[in-house]
């Protein structure tokens, strides 16, 4: 690795640690010529994951976009940012492990709703109302009834 200060090729690694749940390595380096210290990151190059939207438009998957939607759904709710991040990471992990380079926005939404329903019901309803684009109050009420029935069946077990 070249020193970013003097371009010398001889550097030594002072510290190396995994980051991003082991998907990357952060290395602290020092130039053997000038003593300049700098940080490098090593990441696995991932094949882009393409999302096929409802209208057929294709775009690259963005964890940040997913996070924004989750943060919006969990706004003013007792849901920690770490929980939101773990949901986004879990969804991305499932998508990448499936091995399909293209995924429908529908399947992403269903995964998010499944995970979010276990965390906070109000956030789940908020996300579902935007994702499923409820046309009227009866569809919205049907979704709420499903949540209530699911809760009752879980408590009965």
UniProtKB/Swiss-Prot annotation:
Cofactor annotation: Zn(2+)
Signal peptide (residue range): none
Alphabetized UniProt keyword annotations: ATP-binding, DNA-binding, Metal-binding, Nucleotide-binding, Repressor, Transcription, Transcription regulation, Zinc, Zinc-finger
Presence of the UniProt keyword Iron in the record: no
UniProt domain ATP-cone: residue ranges: 49-139
Zn finger residue spans: unnamed: 3-34
Gene Ontology MF terms in the entry: ATP binding; DNA binding; zinc ion binding
Cofactor binding notes: Binds 1 zinc ion.
Superkingdom of the source species: Bacteria
Pfam family, one: ATP-cone
InterPro entries: ATP-cone_dom, NrdR-like_N, RNR_NrdR-like
Gene Ontology BP term (one): negative regulation of DNA-templated transcription
Annotated family: Belongs to the NrdR family.
Function recorded in the entry: Negatively regulates transcription of bacterial ribonucleotide reductase nrd genes and operons by binding to NrdR-boxes.
Protein's name according to its UniProt entry: Transcriptional repressor NrdR
Record organism: Oceanobacillus iheyensis (strain DSM 14371 / CIP 107618 / JCM 11309 / KCTC 3954 / HTE831)
